[in-house]
Regions:
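Conserved alpha-helical scaffold segments that buttress catalytic/binding sites
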Residues: 2-301
Length: 301
């Protein structure tokens, strides 16, 4: 059984406020998911300090909280890299999706890395597909674009790493639910070598076939991989406590069947789980559901 280092990263920096004065509640995710300590029996728990959130623009960047995001991701990268160096398996609990950048920056210190991006959205917004002067960018909706080198240098260039955090060819995106909409915001992802399995295709193929296609893409990449799980990949009837809920979504049992074999594979060097908002879970029922789900993925019976 692998040694898990549980890294709790209480960040909401990459999210937009949903209304004036709103502060996204994802920063409370790690605390609400405290049951993971008992469920996963990690060898250690690391708590990062919550960074201050601001909804306002700042000089030198069109990314909301851009400078704070970079600082926090560099801190996270150091913690994740130390875990990998010890032979442990870092599990980062957020927090918003921009945490992925810090995790990948850590993984890349040891060489190329592949990425399985399980998310109800491709998070591929970048200056090539929206007007940066019309609105502030939210890094949590841009994480895959940033990870593949598209966007401001503030979040695409990292110390000691040449090129993007991950190559297009080494990415598998699972679960996008808006890709067939006529106004799909980042249709340019379709012109990339990223392996894309939208939610409709995933449901048609079934979990076994999705796993086979994902595994084949990872074999071609031929390098260690990182797993990213945004819990909005689940249907909103199952997991409504997220920033951008939607339907359809991946069935929880299917998600376990798709991700658990990847998580326990020796070439998987870590995982993050993001976007759960406890403010939208007043009873704690959804938090308990996520603890159970993650336990099934990373500690299968």
């Amino acid at each position: 059984m692998r040694d898990i280092r549980l890294i709790r990263a209480p960040s909401n920096l990459g999210l937009r406020p949903l209304r004036p004065g709103h502060v996204p509640g994802t920063w409370r995710g790690p605390e609400a998911l405290a049951g993971l300590v008992e469920a996963l029996a990690p060898v250690a728990v690391v708590d990062l300090e919550r960074p201050a959130y601001s909804a306002e623009a700042e000089p030198g960047t069109r990314l909301r909280n851009g400078n704070a995001i970079r600082r926090f991701k560099l801190e996270l990268a150091d913690v994740v890299a130390k875990a990998i160096g010890r032979g442990e398996w870092p599990l980062v609990i957020g927090g918003d999706c921009s945490l992925l950048l810090g995790a990948l920056a850590a993984a890349r210190r040891s060489g190329p890395v592949a990425l399985v991006h399980a998310d109800g959205h491709s998070d591929f917004r970048h200056p090539g597909n929206y007007d940066v002067n019309a609105m502030l960018g939210s890094a949590a909706g841009m994480d895959l674009a940033l990870a593949t080198g598209r966007g401001e240098a503030l979040l695409t260039e990292w110390p000691g790493i040449a090129g993007p955090l991950v190559a297009d060819e080494a990415v598998v995106q699972i679960g996008e639910r808006n890709s067939r909409d006529p106004d799909f915001a980042w249709a340019d992802i379709n012109a990339t070598p990223i392996t894309r399995i939208d939610v409709f295709t995933a449901r048609e193929m079934g979990a076994v076939a999705v796993l086979e296609k994902t595994s084949a893409a990872l074999a071609r990449a031929d390098c260690p991989c990182w797993l990213h799980l945004d819990v909005d990949v689940l249907d909103q009837t199952v997991m409504p406590a997220v920033d951008s809920p939607g339907s359809p979504g991946i069935d929880p049992d299917d998600l376990v069947a798709m991700l658990s074999p990847l998580a326990v594979d020796r070439r998987c060097i870590g995982m993050d789980m993001t976007i759960f908002d406890p403010d939208l879970d007043p009873t704690g029922e959804l938090a308990r559901r996520l603890v159970s789900l993650l336990g099934r993925i990373v500690r299968p019976a």
